[in-house]
């Protein structure tokens, strides 16, 4: 990673659910994009990765390519990376709330923000 030039132009995917080195990753993202554009989740049927069906933070955290907030602050920012991306378009709303809380909210505020966001979603 140190040898990458123009690190400020790179985007690092922090919570990828797709397995590392997945041979179908590009196809997975194409399908997700198409579903979003056409507002039709049925397009994923039969083509989407069975592993990614467990699309949540806990699944992502088990992957070796998972990047935690601590990793961002202690490793990637000092190396010059500045752009980090979170997956969430295919997640259930409450699962995506957990991703946002994990990455963006200080620990002491998480219970309050979680309750507030859950009320909005429900």
Predicted feature descriptions by range:
Residues 1-122:
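Active-site pocket-lining/capping segments in soluble small-molecule metabolic enzymes
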């Amino acid at each position: 990673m140190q040898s990458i030039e123009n690190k400020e132009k790179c985007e690092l995917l922090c919570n990828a659910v797709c397995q590392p080195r997945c041979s179908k990753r590009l196809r997975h993202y194409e399908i997700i994009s198409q579903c979003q554009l056409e507002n039709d989740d049925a397009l994923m049927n039969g083509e989407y990765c069975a592993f990614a069906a467990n699309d949540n933070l806990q699944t992502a955290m088990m992957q070796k390519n998972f990047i935690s907030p601590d990793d961002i602050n202690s490793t990637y920012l000092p190396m010059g990376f500045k752009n980090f991306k979170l997956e969430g378009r295919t997640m259930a709303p409450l699962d995506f709330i957990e991703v946002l809380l994990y990455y963006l909210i200080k620990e002491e505020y998480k219970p309050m923000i979680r309750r507030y966001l859950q009320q909005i979603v429900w």
